[in-house]
Amino acid sequence: MYASNLLYLLALWNLWDLSGGQQDIPNGKATLPSPQTPQNTIDQIGINQNYWFTYNALKQNETLAIIDTMEMRIASSLLEFKAQMEIQLQPLKIIMRHHASNIKASNNIKMRRFEKVGSRHFHIEKNLMQTWFEAYVTCRKMNGHLANIQDEMELDGILALAPNNSYWIDISKLVENGGTFVSTLTGREPFFVKWKSNQDTKKKNQCVYIYAKEMSYDECFEKKSFVCQADQWA
């Protein structure tokens, strides 16, 4: 039995020797295989960074060049568009100048119909008889407004230029059964009133007229002369 165990050990030794086990363990110690050199070393990272910096700089320059080209094209297109618009607008400018001249001439003609009273201008219609509403429209067509009389001096000045007649002015009370007299120009109560005493308060649609240096009211659909003021504001 001792001899058979010895033969078994010798056989194992021969197999280990044939497999190169002695080469793997020099001086009786095992060693690991040498590691491979890594591809992404610090130097390689630096090279890649320089590459990307260069690439980004080139792309940035390329982008800036594209933007400059686009700006030049846009500027050129705008100049061309402006030139075309100037050409196309010339006839319109001529028409507008002509129209403005006509308006100015028309306004001058209309202003000749107004007379100066104090610091303001009024048109005293002495021939045409209209309802209060028609008189309002007529004054607007003259680029004026039914008169808002500001004080007694102005009232006396207007009536001094007018024959003894009744003249609509811009004061009315169109609400039945109550309400107050207002100016259509301001939407408020009038600046100045000088009422005639003992007036009929039962009249509907009461509109104000001046007569004999006093103010009275009548139904708005009655026909009377009227006074326009040149200014269209209060």
From Swiss-Prot:
Substitution effect: residue 171 to V: In strain: NFS 5.2
Disulfide bonds: 139-228, 207-220
Coiled-coil features, chain-numbered ranges: none
Sugar attachment sites: 61, 164
GO terms under cellular component: extracellular space
GO biological process, alphabetically ordered: sexual reproduction; sperm competition; sperm storage
Annotated function: Responsible for physiological and behavioral changes in mated female flies.
InterPro entries per record: C-type_lectin-like, C-type_lectin-like/link_sf, CTDL_fold
Pfam (any one): Lectin_C
Effect of residue 27 to S: In strain: SFS 1.2
Keyword terms: Behavior, Disulfide bond, Glycoprotein, Lectin, Secreted, Signal
UniProt cross-references to SUPFAM superfamilies, sorted A to Z: C-type lectin-like
Database matches in CDD domains: CLECT
GO molecular-function terms, A-Z: carbohydrate binding; galactose binding; signaling receptor activity
UniProt domain C-type lectin: residue ranges: 137-234
Organism of origin: Drosophila melanogaster
Annotated compartments: Secreted
Organs and tissues of expression: Main cells of the accessory gland and in seminal fluid.
Record's protein name: Accessory gland protein Acp29AB
Signal peptide: 1-21
Gene3D superfamilies reported for this sequence: Mannose-Binding Protein A, subunit A (3.10.100.10)
Entry annotated with the keyword Chaperone: no
First-listed, main subcellular location of the protein, grouped into a coarse class: secreted
